[in-house]
A protein has these predicted regions:
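Short microdomains enriched in Cys/His and/or Lys/Arg
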Residues: 205-229, 290-311
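Membrane-interface junctions of multi-pass transporters
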Residues: 147-191
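Acidic/negatively charged segments and metal-coordination signatures
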Residues: 242-312
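Radical SAM enzyme [4Fe-4S]-AdoMet core and its adjacent flexible, acidic
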Residues: 2-4, 11, 15-123, 127, ...
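Charge-rich, low-complexity terminal tails
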Residues: 215-257
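Short, intrinsically disordered, charge-biased short linear motifs at domain edges
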Residues: 170-177, 182-185, 201-206, 255-262, ...
């Protein structure tokens, strides 16, 4: 079937060292299975680069999704809270096991925003408009989600792309992303990370009753507030000259069963938290007779290791 053919093609790319990433859409069905989706992509498919794109299809009065109109969504569109749970669950798996070996575009963008850099994704930048969509016939549009007649800027055969990017019309399109935020967005604690997401899905109503709130606002808010502390830890590690992957040991140490596992582990074995220290010098230390080992190296050693999956 199609699945088998796709997997054969993927193995062929891997065999010849061809770089690729997997773009996975998140819909109302697979959003209920975050770990199954993530572990398939990272473990079974063996990919290192993952994009997770939420499906949000607006329906107009005719029940069609041909234009950016209407406030109803299709049955396959992911629900806001469902999407938030999906993303936070995958992040928790990633931040404990796969930092530095699996790259999830949304997570990378979040870290960049916490560092005060450009996220690298137009949806999470303050303004947009720097990435035109070009169709097969050369028609150019304001953005990938705006391939509609009223957003057509011209044709590449008639006008240089740089001219269209710098046009007053396109520049205003980009500024509209920040200039049309709702009051709820403007006072939001994670606005610096979200920036209202893509305007094409701002068709919901804010808590204040103001139109123009992003449909997935509740999900994104859950995600960005959830990752705040571990991402701040990654930023602190980076600023201290240590690899961001050291955060995995920090997060594993907070797993409820770490202390229990450490109490049962041989005292000279590596601590179950993944720090690289002996158990007796980490979570298995029971008295002052077991002083910490000298820390002339980073406490949390970021050596390649097999992924440690939490039991479900």
């Amino acid at each position: 079937g199609t699945f088998d053919r796709v997997m054969r093609g993927l193995r062929l790319l891997q065999k010849h060292g061809v770089e690729y990433n997997l773009l996975t859409t998140v819909n109302r069905i697979n959003a209920d299975y975050p770990l199954e989706v993530y572990r398939f992509l990272s473990d079974e498919a063996g990919t290192e680069w993952i994009q997770l794109i939420p499906i949000v299809e607006r329906l107009d009065s005719d029940g069609l999704g041909l234009r950016l109109e209407g406030t109803d969504v299709s049955d396959r569109s992911v629900r806001p809270e469902q999407f938030g749970r999906f993303m936070t669950t995958i992040f928790d798996e990633w931040v404990r096991n796969d930092v530095g070996t699996v790259y999830v575009q949304t997570f990378e963008a979040a870290v960049r925003n916490w560092l005060g850099m450009s996220s690298g994704m137009c949806v999470f930048n303050e303004n947009c408009g720097n990435a035109l969509a070009v169709e097969h016939n050369g028609d150019e549009y304001s953005g990938d989600h705006y391939v509609e007649p009223k957003y057509q800027l011209g044709n590449i055969a008639d006008t240089q792309m740089v001219e269209l990017l710098g046009s007053d019309r396109q520049r205003q399109f980009g500024r509209d992303k920040s200039e049309t935020l709702t009051k709820q967005c403007l006072r939001c604690e994670v606005r610096f990370a979200c920036h209202g997401e893509c305007p094409k899905s701002r068709f919901a109503v804010s808590d204040d009753g103001e139109p123009g709130q992003h449909y997935l606002c509740a999900g994104w808010y859950e995600f960005f507030t959830h990752i705040d502390r571990p991402v701040k830890a990654m930023v602190a590690l980076r600023e201290a000259g240590r690899p961001a992957s050291d955060v995995m040991a920090i997060m594993r140490a907070e797993m409820p069963d770490v202390v229990t596992l450490a109490s049962k582990a041989p005292r000279n074995s590596p601590c179950p938290c993944g720090s690289g220290l002996k158990t007796k010098h980490c979570h298995g230390a029971t008295s002052t007779s077991d002083p910490p080992e000298p820390t002339t190296y980073p406490v949390f050693v970021a050596e390649p290791r097999r992924r440690v999956r939490e039991s479900q």
